Design a protein with these regions (language model features):
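Membrane-embedded helix-loop-helix hairpins and adjacent transmembrane boundary segments
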Residues: 1-509, 519, 528-532
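Hydrophobic alpha-helical transmembrane segments
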Residues: 511-513
């Protein structure tokens, strides 16, 4: 057997062992199968939140964007996703408390509890399911491309292999098997990506020298707004805006809010999130930038395979295969959570399953995995464009109904339904290119219209059926922190530094170093904010 295939199979069998190990425990109850008993500790929650969110997009999409756009893509991801962790407190902390008190299992359980509308609950779940399916296919697409590029496995064979193993261990072990594989895969993703980064930097001629060469040939890759002006102000701001509203609406992340042992456990994840995003996202974007030196003329479609191409160029067959398992870990750790969460929503929100009847749940996991694979048969041109046009915008539309439901007593079912219908109609219109907004991402007008519809319809309609007893008030001390986080957000949009020829320090533009520091500052701000909250 080819040594490269053997390495991949050993890794996959190792992940399968977790499913087998937790098989008996997963049969105890739905809470155990879907939520791991609601008692995840700090370390496990941090790794499962990070690994679940950092998908194939993080490895292949970011490196591809680094190749095409340059370092201009790094801050909108590193700082933008780190700043997004504030929503883990705004939304996640409240969902954690309510889920324990009121026995939520799926994201739409909160929607039904708050708005007392079965139609709205099903609509909310349907939107999550429809817009997450393409994201599942992204993991299959990336696995097929990476295995094809590195070890020559046919694209569909690689996609089917990874999808099949993920479906198997999820069906066997439930969330507890996922959490422990997330811990292992999260470590692999970070350590192996770091090793790949160091090897590529060293063998391409040295980090600083390689960047100087890239800067001489393509200065826009180290400048803003990036290669070909890809990241103008409106797009830059739009991405930061998008992550804040879209990421907490990922059903697999939303459900993770319910599994923390306590609020302090969730707070630990919030504090360290900007650190891990600033570090890991830099590595993957930087690998793409350095790839310009080794492969200067890739087609747009081929840019998403720059990571395995560089491993093939600069490492041995065995080492390259070992390191690529880190990227496979990234996509598996997202796919497994998506499959389990969507299964919980389909079986709980649309069908009634008798106690301890797990067969339908496992069949649902298999069906979802199959659908994701079928979408991957005809992959889109680039990972970034595909999910930006579908998943992120479609899920972000749900945020006003959730945030308004948590904090605004006047919010009602009519406003929530209208906001979702208006928002998704705009998502479809943008996707079909019936609407165009030059120089700004669609998410900005979409969220503006969605929020306006939610507020106006709630104000001008009456409904006495809502459960307003679970609405939270905003503490005065929390309001004092609004200016602090506003300033940090403005600092993350440092447009006053744009358009200048960058000064390089250690091969990197000074503004990239600025964002390293800003990520650390954001983490410290989260720490102080969450500490003072408990005083």
């Amino acid at each position: 057997m080819d040594l490269r295939i053997l390495v991949i199979l050993v890794y996959l069998l190792f992940t399968l062992a977790f499913g087998i190990g937790f098989r008996k425990r997963a049969k105890e109850s739905k809470v155990e199968f879907f939520l791991a008993g609601r008692n995840l500790t700090k370390l496990l929650l941090f790794f499962t939140m990070a690994a679940t969110n950092f998908s194939a997009f993080t490895i292949f999409g970011f490196s591809g964007a680094g190749y095409r756009i340059g370092y201009s893509f790094y801050p909108v991801m590193g700082f933008g996703t780190g700043f997004m962790a504030l929503s883990f407190h705004i939304i996640g902390g409240k969902i954690l408390k309510l889920s324990r008190d009121r026995d939520y299992i799926t994201p739409s359980d909160f929607i039904f509890d708050r708005y007392q509308s079965l139609f709205l609950k099903k609509l909310f779940s349907l939107v999550m399911i429809v817009f997450t399916l393409p994201y599942i296919s992204i993991q299959a697409i990336a696995s097929g491309k990476s295995l094809e590029s590195l070890i020559g496995l046919p694209y569909l064979g690689g996609a089917l292999l990874i999808t099949g193993f993920v479906v198997t261990y999820v069906a066997l072990g439930g969330l507890r098997s996922i959490v422990w594989t997330d811990f292992m895969q999260g470590l692999m993703m970070v350590l192996f990506t770091l090793c790949a980064f160091l090897i590529i930097a060293s063998r391409s001629g040295g980090f600083a020298a390689t960047h100087q060469g890239v800067f001489n040939a393509h200065p826009d890759l180290l400048s803003r707004p990036g290669m070909g002006g890809a990241m103008p102000y409106g797009v830059w701001f739009g991405y930061l805006f998008l992550w804040f509203f879209a990421d907490p609406m990922f059903p697999q992340l939303f459900q993770r809010f319910m599994v923390a042992k306590d609020e302090e456990t969730l707070n630990t994840t919030i504090v360290f999130y900007p650190i891990i995003t600033s570090f890991l996202f830099f590595l993957t974007v930087s690998i793409g930038v350095m790839g310009r030196g080794a492969f200067p003329d890739l087609s747009r479609e081929a840019t998403d395979t720059i990571f395995p191409m560089l491993l093939g160029q600069y490492t041995s067959v065995f080492l390259g295969t070992v390191l690529i398992t880190g990227s496979i870990a990234a996509l598996m750790s997202t796919m497994d959570s998506q499959l389990l969460t969507l299964t919980s929503m389909i079986t709980s929100d649309f069908f009634t399953i008798r106690r301890n009847e797990v067969l339908k749940e496992k069949i649902t996991i298999i069906v979802l995995g199959t659908l994701g694979f079928l979408i991957a048969i005809r992959p889109p041109q680039t990972i970034l464009e595909f999910i930006s046009a579908t998943t992120f915008n479609g899920l972000a539309v749900l945020a006003p109904a959730v945030i308004g439901g948590l904090y605004w007593k006047s919010a009602n079912r009519y406003g929530a339904v209208t906001s979702i219908l208006v928002g998704e109609s705009m998502v479809i219109a943008y996707y079909l290119q019936l609407i165009h907004t030059k120089g700004i991402l669609p998410i900005v007008p979409i969220i503006a219209a969605t929020t306006a519809a939610f507020v106006l319809v709630s104000l001008f309609t009456k409904s006495d059926k809502e459960n307003r007893h679970i609405v939270f008030s905003i503490h005065r001390r929390a309001l004092l922190w609004i200016p602090v986080f506003t300033v940090l957000f403005v600092l993350g949009n440092d447009f006053w530094n744009w358009g200048r020829r960058p000064l390089l320090l250690g091969g990197l533009p000074l503004w990239v170093w600025y964002y390293f520091g800003l990520g650390i500052l954001l983490s410290l701000a989260f720490k102080l904010f969450l500490q003072r909250k408990h005083v």
